[in-house]
Amino acid sequence: MRALIQRVSEASVTVEGELLGEIGPGLLILVCAMQGDGEDQASALAARIAKLRIFKDEAGKMNRSVRDTGGAALVVSQFTLAADTSRGNRPGFSAAAPPADGERLYRHFAAEIAACGIPTATGRFGADMKVRLLNDGPVTIWMES
């Protein structure tokens, strides 16, 4: 699985004008299941992100996790993280998991983040979503499992 993690002051996701999820301080996690991924990869990535120390401590160093700060997570599916731009001008997405697998793993990943004790909001898999965020830092991290 691939994830793009952004430290945010706030973030929200809407579909067709309906607010699906919003958080205050925490993480916006854009996530994509890849061909061959399974629940083990989703669980491992969620556990790593839950422990990722990218929030400042009292000394101003990135030494605290979202869980340590009492922050939340907004998990949004984004198959375009599987883009192959090595040839031509149009990205290919054949490395992404098939939609049924992608949705199952997206839901599993979000549930694993929540199981780590992090309040979790989600988007809607496969929908045309509008994501708003206020970056904090900015801090943006790319992770794979």
Swiss-Prot record:
Q: Which GO terms describe its biological process?
A: D-amino acid catabolic process
What's one Pfam family the UniProt record gives for this protein? Answer: Tyr_Deacylase
Keywords from UniProt, A to Z, are: Cytoplasm, Hydrolase, RNA-binding, tRNA-binding
Q: Where is this motif: Gly-cisPro motif, important for rejection of L-amino acids?
A: 137-138
- Which Gene3D superfamilies does this chain map to? D-tyrosyl-tRNA(Tyr) deacylase
User: Under the GO molecular function aspect, what terms does this record hold?
Assistant: D-tyrosyl-tRNA(Tyr) deacylase activity; Gly-tRNA(Ala) deacylase activity; Ser(Gly)-tRNA(Ala) hydrolase activity; tRNA binding
Q: Where in the cell is it found?
A: Cytoplasm
* E.C. number: 3.1.1.96
What catalytic reaction does the record list?
glycyl-tRNA(Ala) + H2O = tRNA(Ala) + glycine + H(+); a D-aminoacyl-tRNA + H2O = a tRNA + a D-alpha-amino acid + H(+)
Q: What is known of its domains?
A: A Gly-cisPro motif from one monomer fits into the active site of the other monomer to allow specific chiral rejection of L-amino acids.
Family statement drawn from the similarity comment of this UniProt entry: Belongs to the DTD family.
Listed name of the protein = D-aminoacyl-tRNA deacylase
Organism, as annotated: Cereibacter sphaeroides (strain ATCC 17029 / ATH 2.4.9) (Rhodobacter sphaeroides)
